[in-house]
Regions:
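Well-ordered, non-membrane alpha-helical segments in soluble/globular domains
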Residues: 1-2, 127-130, 165-171
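Long, well-ordered, tryptophan-enriched scaffold segments
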Residues: 4-22, 26-118
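Generic, well-ordered alpha-helical scaffold segments in large soluble proteins
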Residues: 8, 132-139, 174, 178
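Loop/turn elements at helix/coil->beta-strand transitions in domains of secreted/extracellular proteins
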Residues: 13-18, 142-146, 180-183
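An acidic- and aromatic-residue-enriched active-site/binding cleft used to recognize and process polar
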Residues: 23-28, 152-153, 188-191
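Alpha/beta-hydrolase fold catalytic core
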Residues: 95-144, 153
C-alpha cells in the first residue's frame, strides 16, 4: 500500500494526492500533548485542572469486560474543552483554521476512546471508526472518495462473525448501509506465505515472531483458490455468484482470520 501510494502521488498535484488519515480509536498516545501544545501556543484560557483530564483519558487503560462509568465522568469535561476551543476559534481573526480543526479532531478521537473505555465491545469500536470515516470523507476528501484499509472482519458488508450469538455491526456494515452502492469492499485471502504474530508469554516480555505457511490449511477457500495460475487476482462476487462457481462460493468453508496480534500457531485461526 505504501509503495502504491508513493507511486500514485509521484506525478500528482497536491490536491490530487492520496493522504493518510487514522480512523481507529483504540490507541490515543500523545493526543493530550498535541492539544496541550496547541493551547499553549495560542494562549487559550483553559485551566490546568481541565487540561489534566486530557492526560487522565489518554493514560486510562481499557479493562475489557469490566463495567465502568469512566465515559460518563470524563466526557463532560472533554466537551467543556471542546467548547472553549470552538468559541475561541469563532472569536479569532486571521487564525489558521487548519490548526484549530486538527486540535478539535484530535480531541474528538480522545472522546471516542473515552467512550470505548466504558463500552469496550467490537461493535462500539467499529461504530466510532465509522463516525471517523464519515468525518474524514466530509471534511478532507475533495471528490468524496476514500480508500479504507482494515482487517477483513472490519470492512466486510455483513458484520462480524456471530461470536457468542451476538449480531454485531462492524465498520463495513455501517458503511454499506450509509453509502449503499458507493461502498465496495474487497476482502483478502491467502494460502501460503510468512505470517507475523505477537506472542504473549506469562512472566516474559511479549515478542513478535514470524511463521511460514508452506501450504494452505485443508478444507479452506484458500486450498482451492491457491491452485489458480495467477499469484494475485480478484474475484468480482456479483459476477461469480451468477456463474458455475456459485455453488463453491456459497458453501460454508473455513478461512483464516487474523486480528491485531496476528498469527498464533497454537491457536485455531480458522
Amino acid at each position: 500500500l505504501l509503495k502504491w501510494m508513493r507511486d500514485y502521488n509521484s506525478n500528482k498535484n497536491k490536491d490530487e494526492q492520496v493522504y493518510f488519515y487514522g480512523m481507529d480509536i483504540q490507541y490515543v498516545k500523545n493526543i493530550n500533548q498535541k492539544i496541550r501544545d496547541f493551547v499553549l501556543k495560542k494562549k487559550i484560557p483553559i485551566n490546568e485542572e481541565l487540561l489534566n483530564t486530557l492526560d487522565k483519558c489518554v493514560n486510562k487503560k481499557i479493562d475489557y469486560g469490566k463495567k465502568s462509568n469512566w465515559e460518563e465522568i470524563q466526557t463532560p469535561k472533554l466537551n467543556e474543552i471542546e467548547n472553549v476551543l470552538i468559541e475561541y476559534q469563532k472569536n479569532s481573526k486571521n487564525e489558521n483554521n487548519t490548526e484549530f480543526n486538527s486540535a478539535i479532531r484530535a480531541l474528538n478521537y480522545l472522546k471516542k476512546y473515552t467512550y470505548y473505555v466504558q463500552n469496550n465491545y467490537s461493535q462500539d469500536r467499529d461504530l466510532k471508526m465509522f463516525e471517523n470515516v464519515q468525518r474524514i470523507i466530509e471534511n478532507k476528501s475533495k471528490n468524496g472518495k476514500a480508500f479504507i484499509w482494515a482487517h477483513n472482519e472490519h470492512i466486510n458488508n455483513k458484520g462480524f462473525g456471530n461470536y457468542n450469538n451476538r449480531n454485531i455491526y462492524n465498520l463495513g456494515r455501517h458503511l454499506k448501509e450509509n453509502y449503499q452502492n458507493d461502498y465496495y469492499s474487497v476482502g483478502f485471502d491467502f494460502g501460503t506465505g510468512t505470517l507475523g504474530g505477537y506472542i504473549f508469554t506469562e512472566n516474559k516480555s511479549n515478542e513478535w515472531k514470524t511463521y511460514k505457511l508452506d501450504k494452505p490449511f485443508s478444507k479452506t477457500y484458500a486450498e482451492t483458490l491457491n491452485q489458480a495460475k495467477d499469484d494475485v487476482y480478484f474475484i468480482d462476487m456479483s459476477i461469480a455468484l451468477k456463474s458455475k462457481v456459485a455453488s463453491f462460493l456459497k458453501k460454508k468453508t473455513n478461512q483464516i482470520i487474523l486480528g491485531g496480534p496476528g498469527y498464533n500457531p497454537n491457536r485455531n485461526n480458522l
